[in-house]
């Protein structure tokens, strides 16, 4: 990873920046949705919002460590760069579990709220959260598939909420 990034530093930085912006928007939207729950699901929504904020912190720490590793590698300090990159990758290990907890809590809050999303869509948040929490650490490919499904769930929910606002 470090060799590839050093050879194509501009492309790597662009990919990191676009990915970072995407993930900040996605996690912020989930945190805001959790905070918007006002009735029966308010407590679960608030806790989900905190969990999504923690997931965002994992992203920031991991990216910072990885960028530091790339700088050290470019300076020729390969041993320290590899150590930092391993720490960056290790920070990601908690990502699927926290993400699954966040989705589950948000989904339960949405089910209890009965608005703004239909119960089926809210229930899919719960299902995606439980599946991500349990299955993502077992199999990387399955974890990534669950991640993509959860992104589609968020997009679908966003479209539904935007149409409902009109």
Model regions and ranges:
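Hydrophobic, aromatic-enriched alpha-helical segments typical of multi-pass transmembrane helices
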Residues: 1-166
């Amino acid at each position: 990873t470090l060799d590839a990034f050093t050879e194509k530093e501009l492309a790597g930085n662009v990919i990191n920046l676009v990915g970072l912006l995407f993930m900040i928007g996605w996690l912020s939207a989930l945190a805001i949705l959790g905070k918007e729950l006002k009735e029966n699901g308010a407590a679960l929504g608030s806790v989900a919002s905190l969990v999504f904020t923690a997931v965002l912190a994992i992203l920031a720490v991991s990216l910072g460590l990885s960028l530091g590793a790339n700088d050290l590698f470019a300076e020729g300090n390969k041993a320290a760069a590899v150590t930092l990159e391993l720490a960056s990758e290790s920070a990601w290990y908690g990502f699927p579990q926290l993400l699954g907890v966040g989705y589950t809590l948000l989904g339960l809050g949405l089910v209890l709220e009965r608005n703004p999303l239909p119960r089926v869509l809210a229930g899919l948040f719960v299902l995606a959260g439980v599946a991500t929490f349990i299955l993502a650490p077992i199999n990387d490919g399955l974890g990534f598939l669950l991640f993509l499904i959860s992104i589609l769930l968020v997009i679908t929910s966003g479209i539904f909420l935007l149409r409902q606002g009109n």
